[in-house]
């Protein structure tokens, strides 16, 4: 027993396939996964956002604008949608992903360490509470309801047409 003065020399060696991959992306080589054909919405969570120019702006056959106006409007719509989306994701995607990660981690921790133990404790205590509640019901509420029922059973009403 005493003060240790030696430095510990610890190194961790892991093969690339030794740890669990929770996502498809291999973070050791992200350039390998810059495939634009990859489906980033496999569960179709945002299928309602797949709108095009024709879904938003439509001219009936009787009223058409000039062809050049239609083509320029379509091009400007697509370019602005692309540029603004890229611009917003550059500034918002990482902070919002960080906030969402913190939020989900906090909710998971609260659920695992506070909510479920509380629910299990309540379910464990419930049989004795159920016995006490049945006794209170039999002793207090049962006779009270019986008395009120007998009082109202002796009431009679007669309707007469005048």
From Swiss-Prot:
Phosphoserine modifications at: 20, 23, 36
Domain of life: Eukaryota
Entries under PROSITE patterns matching the protein: CAVEOLIN
UniProt entry tagged with the keyword Plastid: no
Record topological domains on the Cytoplasmic side: 1-86, 108-162
Intramembrane feature ranges: 87-107
Pfam families reported in the protein's UniProt record: Caveolin
Reported modifications of this chain: Phosphorylated on serine and tyrosine residues. CAV1 promotes phosphorylation on Ser-23 which targets the complex to the plasma membrane, lipid rafts and caveolae. Phosphorylation on Ser-36 appears to modulate mitosis in endothelial cells. Phosphorylation on both Tyr-19 and Tyr-27 is required for insulin-induced 'Ser-727' phosphorylation of STAT3 and its activation. Phosphorylation on Tyr-19 is required for insulin-induced phosphorylation of MAPK1 and DNA binding of STAT3. Tyrosine phosphorylation is induced by both EGF and insulin.
A GO molecular-function descriptor: protein-macromolecule adaptor activity
Family: Belongs to the caveolin family.
Described purpose of this protein according to its UniProt entry: May act as a scaffolding protein within caveolar membranes. Interacts directly with G-protein alpha subunits and can functionally regulate their activity. Acts as an accessory protein in conjunction with CAV1 in targeting to lipid rafts and driving caveolae formation. The Ser-36 phosphorylated form has a role in modulating mitosis in endothelial cells. Positive regulator of cellular mitogenesis of the MAPK signaling pathway. Required for the insulin-stimulated nuclear translocation and activation of MAPK1 and STAT3, and the subsequent regulation of cell cycle progression.
Protein name per the record: Caveolin-2
């Amino acid at each position: 027993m005493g003060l240790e003065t030696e430095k510990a020399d610890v190194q961790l060696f892991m093969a690339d396939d030794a740890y669990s991959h929770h996502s498809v992306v291999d973070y050791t080589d992200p350039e390998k996964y810059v495939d634009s054909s990859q489906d980033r919405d496999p569960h179709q969570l945002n299928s309602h956002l797949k709108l095009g120019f024709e879904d938003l702006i439509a001219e009936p056959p009787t009223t058409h604008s000039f062809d050049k106006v239609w083509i320029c409007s379509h091009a400007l719509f697509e370019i602005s949608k692309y540029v603004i989306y890229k611009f917003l994701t550059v500034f918002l995607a990482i902070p919002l992903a960080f906030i969402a990660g913190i939020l989900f981690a906090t909710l998971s921790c609260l659920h695992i360490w506070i909510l479920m133990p509380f629910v299990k404790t309540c379910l464990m205590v419930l049989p004795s509470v159920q016995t006490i509640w049945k006794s209170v019901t039999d002793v207090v509420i049962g006779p009270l309801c019986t008395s009120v029922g007998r009082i109202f059973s002796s009431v009679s009403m007669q309707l007469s047409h005048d």
